[in-house]
Amino acid sequence: MRQNPTEPQPHDPRLNHTAHGIFHQIFKVIGPGFVTGASDDDPSGIGTYTVAGASFGFATLWTALFTFPLMAAVQFMCAKIGMITGEGLAGVLRRHYRPGILYAAVCLLLVANTINAGADIGAIAAAINLLAPVSPRLLIVPISILIVLVQIWGSYRLIANAFKWLALSLVAYIGSAFFARPNLHEVLGATFVPTFKLEPQFLSVIVAIFGTTISPYLFFWQANQEVEEEIARGKRTLAERKGASTAELRYAAWDVNIGMLFSNIIMYFIILATGATLFRAGKTHIETAADAAQALQPLVGHFATTLLGIGLIGSGMLAVPILTGSSAYAVAETFGWEHGLDKKPRRASRFYILIAVSTLVGMFINFTRVNAITALFWTSVLNGFLAPPLLVLIMIISNNRTIMENHVNGRIANILGWTATVVMFAAAIALVFTWNQ
């Protein structure tokens, strides 16, 4: 999601250099990138990083440094595809490739998104339980219905503006990591010298980290939000939306990088904080949100559960509409149905029905006996298996001159994109082969 930068005019309120004016200007510029980055740190991400830090201490810190350029490159490719073609990924596949490829890609997305949405809904319920003594099972249905109603009769922008500030509470992991006083030599070594073990548990954590940082749902969402931005500026036909200037592409790259950097900073400090607290204390098996909250105790003490609860609610409410929305975009584009969050429900009824069905199917996943943290972690592992085939398609599309014209990938983008693809394939295959060892 991006905003087209404009030159400030003499009367532009952004020139107001009061604290409020500067804050408002920063908010407008980084807003879209921040929402994308914060939604990548959804409850499944938080759960995965918590398991990583609690299980292996600082051993996976290097993944934050390693995945940042990869995820930034992939997300910019998706943004560029939406900007140049004026369509989402499913629309591009429908127009330029065989139906079997399109259907396979959309099926992979639906499986990943529905399970991920279900796990995130469960995490929101568990987070509310941290704040009030209400059974999470009693909260699942009301939360799901609320999310559907807000998406259909409200707007995602309303959700994003309301809940991205709650997601900011995740910044507390940064403070907690410092207050826990980790060994600086160990931290630096784990950050810059990769540790790798051919063991099922370690490999599952690596696959999960890749799956939750380079996530299938963000591929489709990023491209579609570029299209939504164009429509919001009055470019309602495909011909009007096609193409982008160098300045627009440069700004989109900056916006994506800001969001992904924020996401990975939070990822790094969640692993660091949990490694310095839970792993050090010997609590390597995390089952509940209350267990995960202990990583924040060095900073806020008894308020740890409250702070984590707020963060999980904020990140979950950001992520679930993106998960269900990207599924709805993909299916609607596949069949040529009217779609878009700017459309009224009566005009794009099938699009909104898809959102509702995706949310409700995710809701029913929660009525199993799997605990919240386990569900979040294995959702990320699943994403780690489903993302690589979609990455192959993104790389093929972004190097197709018929589609991208003069904006095909450069050498660095191709190196980063194919590196992400190969590494994720390799990690998933290694996990399969070592599983029974």
Describe the residue ranges of each PLM region.
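Transmembrane alpha-helical segments of multi-pass small-molecule transport proteins
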Residues: V106-C107, L131-W153, S169-F178, S349-G362, ...
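Loop-to-transmembrane helix boundary motifs in multi-pass membrane proteins
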Residues: P99-G100, R137-I140, F303, L307, ...
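Hydrophobic transmembrane alpha-helices that form the core helical bundles
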Residues: K80, I84-T85, L102-P133, I140-S144, ...
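Hydrophobic alpha-helical segments and their helix-loop junctions in multi-pass secondary transporters
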Residues: L168-E199, L203, I209-E228, L393-T402, ...
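Membrane-interface loop-to-helix entry segments
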Residues: P142, Q151-R181, L382, A387, ...
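Flexible loop linkers connecting adjacent transmembrane helices
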Residues: P8-R14, T48-V51, F76-I101, A126-I128, ...
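Extracellular/periplasmic helix-exit of transmembrane alpha-helices
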Residues: L70-I84, N224-A232, L261-D291
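Juxtamembrane transmembrane-helix boundary signature
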Residues: V35-T36, T63-H96, A104-I115
